[in-house]
Swiss-Prot record:
Annotated protein name in UniProt: Protein FixB
Gene Ontology terms: biological process: carnitine metabolic process; fatty acid beta-oxidation using acyl-CoA dehydrogenase
UniProt similarity note: Belongs to the ETF alpha-subunit/FixB family.
Gene: fixB
PANTHER family: ELECTRON TRANSFER FLAVOPROTEIN ALPHA (PTHR43153), PROTEIN FIXB-RELATED (PTHR43153:SF5)
Keywords: Electron transport, FAD, Flavoprotein, Transport
InterPro entries registered for this protein in UniProt: DHS-like_NAD/FAD-binding_dom, ETF_a/b_N, ETF_a/FixB, ETF_asu_C, ETF_asu_C_CS, FixB, Rossmann-like_a/b/a_fold
């Protein structure tokens, strides 16, 4: 048996749902999708869900992951085994841990490939900071996986599909975190994993102000702007949602233009599936040139304006 009888899908990020649903179609005979509202439920059915389970009744001061208890109860009530697919977001991983505990299931994070043999999941993912690929065969009846972006192609919606809709009512967990306040933050409104062209900056750009040079290039060629982890996490020059690497975005654009990025393996794991890699770096020995199809050795601050002017003609 090379499929599970049932798969359960949930995504806290709507843009990740289509790829999770495509993976679900390949891995199981029946697809169940947990959603938070009617609109997401309708989308899930169009993407292939046989059953939609609307999570309902959570108080405003409670967290989405506190649905884990009723989600686990629902999963157990409808089968003695099954596969759970979640995005590898922070909330996805937290929910995976809670579901794994309640289902007595093995949990595997950041899966890059998933296959099923004899009713058991085999998962591959990066280990040792991207230096190797680890393979795990999950023996527990339930398997809970968080999936890296780009592992599956996105499912295409079909408005003619039909499915059944159910409601799962909120039950307060015995121990919970209560939200006392919220603070809005600037976040990435662009789905970088869908971008055809990406310009990505590293610390070699020199300063936060110099990122404007990369933004001008993006505008000239219709690209989206990304960055390396140090730019987002250490320097705080750009939003967390824009950094490319093993622990965040895994991209497959037609063109990845790396500006001032050294090319460490942890970053390149997220970029080396690009069709073409173009690198700009003043260090001729930078590892990025081992991955690049094309490269320029020089100061990005001088090269970017000239490149933008040439491509804008």
């Amino acid at each position: 048996m090379n499929t599970f009888s049932q798969v359960w899908v949930f995504s806290d990020t709507p843009s990740r749902l289509p790829e999770l649903m495509n993976g679900a179609q390949a891995l199981a005979n029946q697809i169940n999708t947990f959603v938070l509202n009617d609109a997401d439920g309708a989308q899930a059915i169009q993407l292939g869900a046989n059953h939609v389970w609307k999570l309902n009744g959570k108080p405003d001061d409670r967290m989405i992951e506190d649905y884990a208890s009723v989600m686990a109860d629902t999963i157990r009530q409808h089968g003695a085994d099954g596969l759970v697919l979640l995005p590898n977001t922070r909330r996805g991983k937290l929910l995976a841990a809670k579901l794994g505990y309640r289902l007595k299931a093995a949990v595997s994070n950041d899966a890059s490939t998933v296959s099923v043999q004899d009713g058991k999941a085999t998962v591959k993912h990066m280990v040792y900071g991207g230096l190797a690929i680890g393979e795990e065969r999950i023996a527990t009846p339930y398997a809970v996986l968080t999936i890296s972006s780009g592992t599956f192609d996105a499912a295409q919606p079909d408005a003619s599909r039909t499915g059944e809709t159910h409601t799962v009512e909120w039950q307060a967990p015995a121990v919970a975190i209560t939200r006392t306040a919220t603070q809005a933050r600037q976040s990435n409104s662009v789905d970088l994993d869908k971008a055809r062209l990406v310009v990505s900056v590293g610390r070699g750009i020199g300063s936060k102000e110099n990122i404007a040079l990369a933004e001008q290039l993006c505008k000239a060629i219709g690209a989206e702007l990304a960055c390396s982890r140090p730019v987002a996490e250490n320097e705080k020059w750009m939003e967390h949602e824009r950094y490319v690497g093993i622990s965040n975005l895994m991209l497959k654009p037609e063109l990845y233009l790396a500006v001032g990025i050294s090319g460490q393996i942890q970053h390149m794991v997220g970029a080396n599936a690009s069709q073409t890699i173009f690198a700009i770096n003043k260090d001729k020995n930078a590892p990025i040139f081992q991955y690049a199809d094309y490269g320029i050795v020089g100061d990005a601050v001088k090269i970017l304006p000239a490149l933008t002017a040439a491509l804008a003609r």
